[in-house]
């Protein structure tokens, strides 16, 4: 039987008028050399690892040293001038920009590089397929603690696992679902891990766990790309005429999310965090990802900043399963033959 698959085809072309450059344009400059650090929320580790590897392959005299930390630690490091670049999910306030300018003579540049989604995952043998936004709110507030409260027959207690305190994922869910002053860690079924990788591994092994994780950790395409020799990967990344098909992992079950409203309360549709639904806004748990730099134009970080917001950098992001920000997007659902 022919069914509509949930893979997404993205036609990539960099938006004009944004002041971003291609890989070859950076080569004409003098500043794709030297070393610098960047602090990144751990949720976006997969993205940054590949961005750095490709950038350093293109510019052998450049070295970008990443530190994967909580979003709070990344922002604190930027404000203390311990680094001149971060990848986070919030922009600097006017007061923060003024502080950096007055204290350290730093002018902050900020660019949205992607639209990420927060996913809820369970063991692939778990019978639960979908949650509503109200379910998530009750989970985070401790009102739901057993599987049979989520339409399953199992009366076993569930556990909620997430990455470290201070991460962008924790902040996003706290601000969206919890009353002021309340923390996810106040919930007796919630357990913090060191990073997203640990969340993924726990859910793979534990049928009673619900994991909260960035969708960028769930894309299959980037992992497959890493198996290809770098020269072939580079040629593919620089190809401006091809398309990208984004698929998510099957090692865990990725829950669909519904957002009941007055209009659809009786039959709300549940959506998985595929790019087509992130792009349309139908998947309700999404947020922007920003790269912020205080480096001067003569610093290697400026070249890296330009690279990430250019065509190659944006194409790398598209392979992670989240939406690159600086591209024209033509998204279609692909037909696949399934029994």
What are the language-model segments listed below?
Residues 3-5, 17, 64, 100, ...:
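Generic hydrophobic, helix-prone segments enriched in Leu/Val/Ile
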Residues 17-19, 105, 337:
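Short, flexible coil/linker elements and helix-boundary hinge sites characteristic
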